[in-house]
Regions:
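C-terminal transmembrane helices and immediately adjacent loops/tails
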Residues: 1-190
Length: 190
C-alpha cells in the first residue's frame, strides 16, 4: 500500500467503525456472569490473541492475497517491475479492498465476545450502521471514482479479485463463529 492508502485505512475506514463499537449496548447476558476479578486487566492476553493472532491472521492473509491474485491473473511473473503501472494500482486497490472487507466482517464479529454475530440484533446500534456506510462509501470512492483513484493511486478492481478475497473474509467469519460456539459450550460445562 502507498502511504496515503495506509492513512485511508487508519483514519478513514478503521476509525469510525471502531468508535461505533464503543457505543455498542452491553451484552444482554452481562449480568448473568460473575464479576471480573479486581486484578484482571481489561485488555488481557486472551483478548490480544483473539484480536491480533486469530482474527488478525485472516485479515493479514486476505490483503496480500488480493494483491498477488490481481498480479498473477494478469500474467505477472516474479521479478517483473510493476510499481506505478495500472496493474500495480489495481493490485494495491485490491489489497485495500481486502482490508476493508475484513474490517466489515470483524466489526460484526466483535460486537460480542461470545454471542454469535447472528444472535446480536442487527439494528441495535445505529452508529455502527452509519460508520459502515461511511467506510463502504470511502472504499467505493477510492476504488471506483476517477478523483479517488487519482488521489489514492488506485485503479478499479475486477470482479474476479473481489470474489477471490471473499472466501478469506467468510473463513474469518466462520472461524470466529466456531470459536464463539466452543467458548459458549465451555462456559455451560463449568
Amino acid at each position: 500500500l502507498t502511504v496515503v492508502q495506509i492513512l485511508a485505512v487508519d483514519l478513514g475506514t478503521d476509525m469510525l467503525p471502531a468508535l461505533a463499537l464503543g457505543t455498542e449496548p452491553p451484552d444482554e447476558t452481562i449480568m448473568d456472569r460473575p464479576p471480573r476479578r479486581r486484578d484482571e486487566r481489561l485488555l488481557d492476553g486472551r483478548t490480544l490473541v483473539r484480536a491480533y493472532v486469530f482474527l488478525g491472521f485472516f485479515e493479514s492473509v486476505a490483503a496480500p492475497a488480493g494483491f498477488f491474485f490481481v498480479l498473477w491473473a494478469s500474467g505477472w511473473k516474479y521479478g517483473e517491475t510493476t510499481v506505478a503501472t495500472p496493474l500495480y494500482r489495481e493490485a494495491t486497490a485490491a489489497t485495500f479492498a481486502g482490508i476493508v472487507m475484513a474490517q466489515v466482517a470483524n466489526v460484526f464479529l466483535c460486537r460480542s465476545e461470545t454471542v454469535s454475530a447472528f444472535a446480536v440484533p442487527l439494528l441495535r446500534n445505529r452508529w455502527l450502521w452509519a460508520a459502515l456506510a461511511t467506510e463502504l462509501a470511502l472504499l467505493a470512492f477510492i476504488v471506483f471514482t476517477p478523483p479517488g483513484q487519482a488521489l489514492f493511486g488506485t485503479a478499479p478492481v475486477r470482479l474476479g479479485a473481489w470474489l477471490f478475497i471473499l472466501p478469506f473474509v467468510v473463513g474469518m467469519f466462520g472461524a470466529e463463529e466456531l470459536r464463539k460456539l466452543v467458548a459458549r459450550r465451555r462456559g455451560r460445562a463449568r
